[in-house]
Amino acid sequence: MTRTHFDSIRAGGLNWSSLPLKLFAGGNAKFWDPADIDFSRDRADWEALTEREREYATRLCAEFIAGEEAVTKDIQPFMSAMRAEGRLGDEMYLTQFAFEEAKHTQVFRMWLDAVGVTDDLHSLIEEVPAYVQIFCEELPAALEALTSDPSPAAQVRASVVYNHVVEGMLALTGYYAWHRICVDRGILPGMQELVRRIGDDERRHMAWGTFTCRRHVAADDANWAVFETHMNELIPVALRLTQEGFALYGDDIPFGLEEGEFLQYSSDRGMRRFGTISSARGRPLAEIDVDYTPLQLEDTFADEDERALTAVKAAAAAAN
């Protein structure tokens, strides 16, 4: 391959108003270092939990850290696909995206080390078949497919798995579980800070995935069917993951969590993505590039979570 030009020095320069570069600037402005999070109190809170509670929390953390490792490893083909399209802004953002995923892997490992969990945890995720299907089969297959087929349809399929199911349903539901555990009891302040920081990063990641699907749907309406079909295939698997995880604990789910609440939460986060993607149908591509609707959707989800957790705090305070 011979390089023939540089996008950064062409006439007009870069479009800093485009969504990918807005996300890039946002990530720079909100940089954080895992080493700055204080996990010192978490160890004492951890030891005060029951054995059953510690097992549940360890499983939840194992699912997160393995998932963060998986997405760190699997994102590279998307960068190559953006390069093939000549989209420097997206490439720039995805370098930051990959760095943040690696940082998330780091910080979950630091937390496990801080609370003294150093055992092999593979068995905890292997007991959840839907987790294995998504993270060991669907995710790597969809992203690896981009190495030989970086077409818009292949990109949409990859984004569905990565951005809309793994991040947009499973990760959000997991963060919500951590918040419910920590906020309800007033425990694990380091984990609370960790989840807050990661959640902020992930909102940008999900917004990029939504943007990518929207621009492909706007360019070719056939890609709407690709999105819709693959989401409808994977949403049941994502919901099954939640069901399988809770089923391991029978009628005595630790921390007083309720399966129905989390199934509703996960389903809601998945289904509301359809409208944001479909709203791009028939739109001019130039409009999509500077339309911040994807980021606004994630901010709406974050605001809703904040209100729900404020209500949990109020209820806990009233009970005491």
Curated annotation (Swiss-Prot):
Its cofactor is Fe cation; Mn(2+). One of its GO terms (molecular function) is oxidoreductase activity. Mn(2+) binds at residues 68, 101, 104. The keyword Oxidoreductase applies. There is a cross-link at residues 71-162 (3-(O4'-tyrosyl)-valine (Val-Tyr)). Gene3D superfamilies: Ribonucleotide Reductase, subunit A (1.10.620.20). Its EC number is 1.-.-.-. It comes from the Bacteria. GO terms for biological process: deoxyribonucleotide biosynthetic process. Keywords: Iron, Manganese, Metal-binding, Oxidoreductase. Fe cation binds at residues 101, 167, 202, 205. InterPro entries: Ferritin-like_SF, R2LOX, RNR-like, RNR_small_fam. Binds 1 Fe cation per subunit. Binds 1 manganese ion per subunit. The iron and manganese ions form a dinuclear manganese-iron cluster. Probable oxidase that might be involved in lipid metabolism. Homodimer. Belongs to the ribonucleoside diphosphate reductase small chain family. R2-like ligand binding oxidase subfamily. This is R2-like ligand binding oxidase. It comes from Mycolicibacterium smegmatis (strain ATCC 700084 / mc(2)155).
